[in-house]
């Protein structure tokens, strides 16, 4: 009797193992699984960071700051020109700002991004040049968007340094570094009145850039 019971248990274990193996095989061969694992590493990383609790918390902080009365309009990311794409947007570089808002009540542009670990300068801190590039790019893109809207033209961002135009102004900015920016940290960029300010997730001011051409 015990031998028969043992055989039944062995049979059930074999069937269970076969079903588990079949289910795992189906999951691995499914289109969703295959599509995800064929994504480039950068796409997977952006997919993961966009669900980060810290990123969500940063957005919540913005709403709380404005006492939930701010009417924000979502816009395309500020960082779209070739300038940051060539110099900062590479693996572990400046992760593209995936959310950009315009607050019409306070006339302020708000963007959220991630300073990649490849932008490390001194002792695992974000390089000062990368920080300056991010702030200047934000200033120039907002300037371009305002000009385009005023002239009812295309709102495509431009590079910070104009080229092939003899009627150009000389770019001039004042960069002030307030606190170290850890590489790989989330940051908020706020642009208002020709000043771009960089904050961390705790709303601490890290750096700012003033456009001296205005």
Curated annotation (Swiss-Prot):
<feature type="transmembrane region" description="Helical">
    <location>
        <begin position="10"/>
        <end position="30"/>
    </location>
</feature>
<dbReference type="GO" id="GO:0016020">
    <property type="term" value="C:membrane"/>
</dbReference>
<dbReference type="GO" id="GO:0047617">
    <property type="term" value="F:fatty acyl-CoA hydrolase activity"/>
</dbReference>
<dbReference type="GO" id="GO:0005739">
    <property type="term" value="C:mitochondrion"/>
</dbReference>
<keyword id="KW-0812">Transmembrane</keyword>
<feature type="compositionally biased region" description="Polar residues">
    <location>
        <begin position="147"/>
        <end position="157"/>
    </location>
</feature>
<dbReference type="GO" id="GO:0006637">
    <property type="term" value="P:acyl-CoA metabolic process"/>
</dbReference>
<dbReference type="InterPro" id="IPR052061">
    <property type="entry name" value="PTE-AB_protein"/>
</dbReference>
<keyword id="KW-0472">Membrane</keyword>
<feature type="region of interest" description="Disordered">
    <location>
        <begin position="147"/>
        <end position="166"/>
    </location>
</feature>
<protein>
    <recommendedName>
        <fullName>Uncharacterized protein C3A12.08</fullName>
    </recommendedName>
</protein>
<keyword id="KW-1133">Transmembrane helix</keyword>
<dbReference type="InterPro" id="IPR029069">
    <property type="entry name" value="HotDog_dom_sf"/>
</dbReference>
């Amino acid at each position: 009797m015990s031998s028969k019971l043992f055989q039944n248990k062995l049979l059930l274990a074999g069937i269970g193992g076969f079903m588990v193996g079949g289910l795992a095989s189906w999951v691995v061969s499914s289109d969703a699984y295959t599509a995800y694992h064929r994504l480039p590493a950068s796409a997977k990383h952006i997919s993961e960071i966009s669900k980060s609790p810290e990123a969500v918390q940063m957005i919540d902080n913005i709403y709380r700051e404005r006492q939930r009365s701010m009417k924000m309009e979502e816009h395309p990311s500020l960082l779209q020109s070739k300038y940051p794409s060539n110099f900062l947007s590479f693996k572990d570089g400046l992760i593209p700002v995936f959310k950009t808002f315009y607050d019409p009540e306070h006339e302020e542009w708000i963007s959220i991004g991630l300073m990649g670990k490849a932008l490390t300068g001194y002792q695992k801190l974000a390089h000062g040049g990368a920080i300056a590039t991010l702030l200047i790019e934000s200033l120039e893109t907002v300037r371009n968007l305002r000009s385009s809207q005023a002239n009812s033209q295309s709102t495509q961002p431009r590079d910070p340094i104009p080229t092939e135009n003899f009627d150009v102004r000389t770019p001039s900015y004042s960069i002030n570094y307030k606190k170290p920016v850890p590489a790989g940290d989330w940051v908020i960029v706020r642009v208002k009145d020709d000043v771009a300010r960089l904050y961390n997730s705790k709303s601490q001011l890290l750096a700012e850039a003033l456009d001296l051409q205005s």
